[in-house]
């Protein structure tokens, strides 16, 4: 297979963009991605595009992207894989170039979910990302769904709600330096623990906000990458993992098998181990999910993720900085855009240009998990080709 690199990346601020639609947000992210290509790129050089969008607030996604960006002369494909949509869209673009089909492609992720109340949005998402014969009628919207796992994890491990609060505090702290983050303010452990309960064990500060936003990356084959930059960020590995959809069929509620499978696949393709990862963007839709994911991604042994938190090793400056962007928790979470935005952050990290820079970062990991914990996508990036 041919090697593939990111040569440009861009994203909008994440937040409540009531005045903007998908047709506004997508061009903003695309324009920044094009502007960040060091040696420039012409629209005519883009041969295909993939568009990750979970919702369809503006209608037919792939047609809207083609129309809005004036890319009607190339194939555009919509990708939807619950909250793993963003990194799966990147995976599709990577595979298309690796196969030899194209030399240069565009990957965009976007969603606009703040047009409705949070309660309405939860049910709309659940209808798209749950088993409608079982989980959906039982009311397993996202907080309840993930709470089942995290409650069991807290029961079986030494971790406590204080550790969840410490994850939230860290992500808010990291977001302070990110001008595109939605929640740019600090919180304390005491505030997090005293916040109103959403569903046990999650308080308000354990939950990601719902967000509007878009992100884009431009991918190029190794044969042509020198046309665009002398500082490419290589996509070393990609992986997708799956699991049972209905919760009564899940074997262990204290782990996310899709994450384990996706991480193993991506790391095998990249030729790296968890110890090689210098910085990670982890899918912290809820604080407990970040904690469990430390173990599933191989950063901590079984039931020992709390040690990373207590040692502050997950901060920038620690042994495994996680979510220097602020993560979903504080940066925001437009589902289709989230994974692509993770790649945007890591593109900047690996080029030494991030707002919250991890010194000497060489290898980075992006991670999504979605649906009823039934799908995960992992991408491994590096500023080194091999």
Where are the language model's segments positioned?
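Conserved active-site "lid/cap" helical segment
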Residues: 1-84, 153-160, 182-188, 192, ...
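Condensing-enzyme catalytic core mediating Claisen C-C bond formation in acyl metabolism
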Residues: 1-23, 166, 197-261, 265, ...
């Amino acid at each position: 297979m041919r090697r593939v690199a990111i040569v440009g990346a861009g994203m909008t601020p994440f937040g409540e963009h009531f005045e903007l639609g998908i047709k506004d947000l997508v061009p903003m992210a695309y324009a920044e991605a094009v502007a960040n290509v060091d040696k420039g790129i012409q629209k005519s050089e883009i041969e295909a595009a993939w568009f990750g969008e979970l919702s369809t607030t503006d209608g037919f996604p792939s047609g809207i992207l083609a129309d809005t960006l004036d890319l009607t002369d190339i194939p555009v494909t919509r990708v939807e894989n619950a909250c793993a949509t963003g990194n799966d869209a990147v995976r599709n673009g990577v595979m298309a170039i690796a196969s030899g089909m194209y030399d240069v492609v565009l990957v965009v992720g976007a969603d606009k979910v703040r047009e409705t109340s949070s309660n309405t949005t939860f049910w709309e998402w659940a209808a798209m990302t749950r088993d409608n014969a079982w989980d959906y009628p039982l009311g397993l919207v996202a907080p309840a769904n993930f709470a089942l796992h995290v409650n069991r994890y807290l029961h079986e491990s030494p971790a406590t709600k204080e550790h969840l609060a410490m994850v939230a505090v860290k992500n808010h702290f990291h977001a302070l330096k990110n001008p595109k983050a939605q929640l740019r303010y600090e919180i304390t452990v005491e505030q997090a623990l005293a916040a109103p309960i959403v569903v046990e064990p999650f308080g308000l500060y354990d939950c990601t906000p719902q967000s509007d936003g878009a992100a884009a990356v431009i991918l190029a084959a190794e044969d042509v990458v020198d046309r665009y930059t002398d500082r490419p960020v290589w996509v070393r590995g990609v992986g997708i993992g799956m699991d049972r959809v209905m919760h009564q069929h899940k074997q262990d509620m204290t782990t996310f098998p899709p994450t384990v499978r996706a991480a193993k696949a991506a790391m095998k393709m990249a030729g790296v181990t968890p110890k090689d990862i210098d910085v990670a963007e982890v899918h912290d839709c809820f604080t407990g999910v970040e904690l469990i994911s430390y173990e599933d991604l191989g950063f901590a042994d079984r039931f020992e993720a709390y040690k990373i938190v207590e040692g502050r090793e997950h901060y920038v400056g620690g042994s495994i900085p996680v979510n220097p962007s602020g993560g979903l928790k504080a940066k925001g979470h437009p589902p289709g855009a989230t994974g692509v935005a993770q790649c945007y952050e890591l593109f900047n990290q690996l080029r030494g240009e991030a707002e919250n820079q991890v010194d000497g970062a060489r290898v980075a990991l992006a991670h999504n998990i979605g649906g009823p914990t039934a799908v995960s996508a992992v991408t491994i990036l590096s500023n080194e080709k091999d």
